[in-house]
């Protein structure tokens, strides 16, 4: 606050309020930011009577005083000193003298004071909101405010008045007193007569208003400053029209913070400024009234447009209709009536002389509308806004909070991508056209489709398009011509051809819409120009791959390096002899069959007896060479028993298997089963046998044919004829078909029965005695000597037998071959042994019968026998006894890690704890059930050995001391003991191994432990260990361990 010049008093500083001092000393950073002001804004703080904590230069504030040269000028403030209040009371009712230049400012200040004198009556207005009444009461009860109120508070209260009570709430002195009204009119007329044109003043104020609009736009784009409560409570009577631009910025901030009006009271409240009083007062001057009305109508139309924009929900529509609506409103301004102008002004007035700006700036003309930047969108508030009032000056808690205004807030839609771009564009561009808003957002790259999972995610990596086209084509012909190495050139040429073929196949499959239709040989497709790879350009194969958007960028950048899977070219070496290839019908080609005619015959073994060959693209089963039908059958054995003694003797001495092999008509043609590896070798050597065999047969066919022509021999009986044919084939097959043998077997069999039996017996004995020699000679004797048949008698045949039967004797006796069947496991052998060779049960269709081995306990028992099933049930239920988790102080005598990690043998004797002895008795009970012992006899002195594997008892041996035993004797399957006694060291009472763990050497290891750890410090000889009543398996174990058939045994 400044003391008027010439008052004669010393300058006095007002004491700051306690809340203001607390805010300055202990305020938060947010409250400190409100104290940051420009140097030009210091006068606003002085008008409140509050001095900030910085140096105040009074010399720089001379130009800010309205009546600096008048000694009687004083400012009316609620925070001034008592002397100043007395002076104000003296000068308030007096006449102030001023010069002509100061007359307009004097008139304006006077009208403001008179119009604001009725602020007390406004507080009791029935149309006020609850928040306004509360603020008015707080301002009235402020300890630093006077009963009349400060001019700034009255000015602010006048802004919030309802439009309906505008004329009723005016100062009655301003309109009721005709003297004051005439005096003011005379002063205005004197001002106009002296040459001060009001039009020039309007233009000047108009320019100032435009400048404030630009400054307001700058406030929007820059970061809004946080104003202090001192600036918000500045009075209007200290706002001269010649203030600086910084002063206008402060006024803009005041207006934005003071005019936050809720949507419900937006239409009822009206910003009422001193400029509106000037408009009403200057209606007496006709030409001035016309100028003001035209200007108000223009501003009112723009304000109505902005009101409709602020209430609209779509910000895009406001921007679209911005230019057109402003033009239409500007053109229709002069045609509106005064009544519509007053009604529109009552809603939201704006005058050129007013320094209070509303939220939405209105451009003056089309040029200004296109020059200044559009404002931020106005969002209607859902909650009741807190407008600044007089309680902010009184240090209320609301004044300590930051003033949140629409201008300084960020809209919620700015956090989203679709609305963030619109906001930034509206800030950067001065005007937005319809075409720019309708353009869709460009997404890069454009060729990539928007996938669902990556929708909205973009990156700045760009693909390199056309990289393959920029590379120079490689001329392979020039490179090959420049090579001097012929071997390398041929290799490259061959590889190029193979690669071309492979690429041709891939190109055909890529271009084919239906791959099944295109699965033809290359020779058929080669003539098709559309699919011929040779007609394509050199670089076409590089671009054949489809542009998949989900592939990596590396594949798109360098498609030349992309290596496709190469189809291997398989070359087969042709064999010497192959079947002729028939011309293939291309129209009847099967799926994916090539046109290459291969002479390779591949053979695959499917099973032991089934083989398949692949030739000419077809797979066929290899047919085994069929034997000729046997002419000697078993049923003929009973036919000749009554009629011919010779045939009866022959069939009596021959086995069924011998008959099956002997009676083959032409065994030379037969081929034995061979492995797949020997197929090629046998196939090549087979033609020699086929070529030479008929020649040998041709030599011997003549006598055999002669014998066949004799049949039937002296009979017409069909049964006898059949017998003669069978006997002749028997003689021919054994190469003993001579005249003498023909007479003995066919012509006169009744007279030569003894000779026939002798011949058959000799033949059978020779085969049995010379079997080894004949098997060795099969591989060494030449094939040409096969067909030679000696014409000798029986003794001669007996001498040359090794030479007469090199091959045919192979089929007389079955050759011992290695069995192809796998060896049966232990369970199968147990089942076979349990079943036996005799049938004790009748198979009447039961689901299961016979011997069975339990998979859990390993016991073999007979199904559907009550005794066997009961035994198995008891043994199976007692299997838990075999579970052994170990003891604390075990007497481990041997460790076997090959069994398991815990494989060991434990020793226990009769001096063990009671719990261990009870566990031993349970174990002996389980063992005796399987061994067949009737009573569980435990000796008084004993040593037991337990084999443990994987926390399971798998073996058990119970040893007792023994001094003498008997020898084991077995006669005709019956076990006997010798009467003599022999010395013994110990006796094995029981030795048992789990059925599932047998045949793994556990019993032998138990006996070895008995030999070494039964007697302390002494190893017992194996011959001195006796066994008690062994079973069949125990007998075999004892013989194997002791090496004696008559081992020691005893009866306990």
Curated annotation (Swiss-Prot):
Function field: Acetyltransferase required for the establishment of sister chromatid cohesion and couple the processes of cohesion and DNA replication to ensure that only sister chromatids become paired together. In contrast to the structural cohesins, the deposition and establishment factors are required only during S phase.
Positions of post-translational Phosphoserine modification: 176-177, 310, 312, 314
Chain positions covered by the region annotation Disordered: 1-45, 61-277, 290-405, 419-452
Biased composition (Low complexity): 114-125, 138-153
Subcellular location: Nucleus
GO terms assigned for molecular function: acetyltransferase activity; protein-lysine-acetyltransferase activity; zinc ion binding
Gene Ontology annotations for the cellular component aspect, listed alphabetically: chromatin; nucleus
Start and end residues of each N-acetyltransferase domain: 906-1052
Name of the featured protein: N-acetyltransferase eco
Zinc finger (CCHH-type): 852-876
Compositionally skewed regions (Polar residues) per UniProt: 99-113, 329-343, 395-405, 432-447
Entry keyword set: Acyltransferase, Cell cycle, Metal-binding, Nucleus, Phosphoprotein, Transferase, Zinc, Zinc-finger
An example Gene Ontology biological process: mitotic sister chromatid cohesion
One Pfam family named in its UniProt record: Acetyltransf_13
Stretches with biased composition (Basic and acidic residues): 290-309
Family per record: Belongs to the acetyltransferase family. ECO subfamily.
Keyword Zinc: yes
UniProt EC number: 2.3.1.-
Disruption phenotype: Flies display disrupt centromeric sister chromatid cohesion very early in division. This failure of sister chromatid cohesion does not require separase and is correlated with a failure of the cohesin component Scc1 to accumulate in centromeric regions.
InterPro entries: AcTrfase_ESCO_Znf_dom (IPR028005), Acyl_CoA_acyltransferase (IPR016181), ESCO_Acetyltransf_dom (IPR028009), GNAT_dom (IPR000182)
Name of the coding gene: eco
